[in-house]
């Protein structure tokens, strides 16, 4: 699943290419992907423009005059810019036609979703989504720690909970906890304020570094047609099972936490 750096990379790519260009037509080939009435969805897009594109956690927010188009890529979603004349592939489910190109939403697993909402309902739409991991303010820390300390779950699992902090997935949770020297098995109830500060500090450092390298491509992520990320070349622990830790030279381990593969250094992160 694309995480914060990958979605930010997609956002930046789209902003460079589609803003302020009239949408001439919209084709919806898999209606279940649209959380509105399809006719309404098309009507509010055709002959309109994307004025700006924002991101919150793993969500893309396309700004129109009166509405926002919210898009979540889920597991395999991606946006590609192609010629209008290009043949439609079997995994292209929503197509936006512009004058001299088309923007195609490609999703092999069909899990992605899109919805048009009114501008005044944006906050309500995100009411159950936590602060963006790359934009956590000091005023957010007390509430975040309160939610973490109420949990009996491992901190690795908590970091994947988008209602607490949004944007972090399996890859970056491993990297953040390694850099913060926190065991992924540590219970939320035992996380201190200082440890949360470390998590927030290294979240921003690692996520921004990943954005610089256009995200991480381990399986299928591309920010545009065939453009892969490069941050997989700089990962410290994720997918590094049985390799030497670059800090202490001990062997990196892999365990399952709530069904998710978790990579860590037992020495650096104090796992016995």
Each model region followed by its residue ranges:
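Basic, nucleic-acid-binding surfaces and adjacent catalytic neighborhoods in DNA/RNA-processing proteins
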Residues: 22-41, 46-49, 54, 59-61, ...
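Phosphate/anion-contacting hairpin/loop surfaces
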Residues: 65, 69-167, 172-179, 187
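Surface-exposed binding/hinge segments that line
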Residues: 1-116
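Alpha-helical structural motif
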Residues: 3-6, 10, 19, 37, ...
């Amino acid at each position: 699943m694309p995480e914060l750096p990958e979605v930010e990379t997609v956002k930046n790519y789209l902003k460079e290419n589609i803003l302020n260009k009239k949408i001439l037509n919209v084709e919806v080939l898999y209606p279940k992907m649209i959380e509105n009435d399809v006719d309404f969805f098309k009507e509010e897009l055709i002959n309109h423009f994307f004025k700006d594109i924002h991101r919150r956690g793993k969500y893309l927010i396309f700004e129109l005059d009166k509405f926002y188009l919210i898009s979540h890529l889920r597991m395999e979603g991606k946006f590609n810019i192609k010629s209008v004349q290009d043949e439609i592939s079997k995994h292209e489910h929503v197509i936006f036609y512009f004058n001299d190109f088309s923007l195609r939403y490609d999703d092999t697993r069909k899990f992605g979703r899109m919805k048009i909402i009114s501008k005044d309902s944006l906050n309500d739409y995100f009411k159950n989504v936590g602060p963006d991991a790359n934009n956590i303010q000091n005023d957010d820390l007390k509430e975040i720690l309160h939610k973490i300390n109420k949990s009996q779950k491992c901190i690795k699992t908590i970091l994947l909970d988008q209602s607490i902090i949004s944007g972090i997935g399996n890859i970056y949770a491993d990297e953040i906890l390694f850099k913060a020297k926190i065991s992924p098995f540590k219970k939320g109830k035992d996380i201190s304020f200082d440890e949360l500060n470390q998590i927030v500090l290294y979240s921003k450092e690692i996520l921004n570094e990943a954005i610089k390298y256009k995200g991480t491509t381990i399986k299928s992520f591309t920010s545009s047609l065939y453009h892969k990320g490069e941050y997989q070349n700089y990962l410290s622990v994720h997918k590094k099972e049985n390799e030497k830790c670059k800090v202490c030279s001990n062997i990196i381990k892999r365990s399952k936490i709530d069904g998710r593969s978790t990579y860590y250094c037992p020495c650096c992160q104090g796992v016995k």
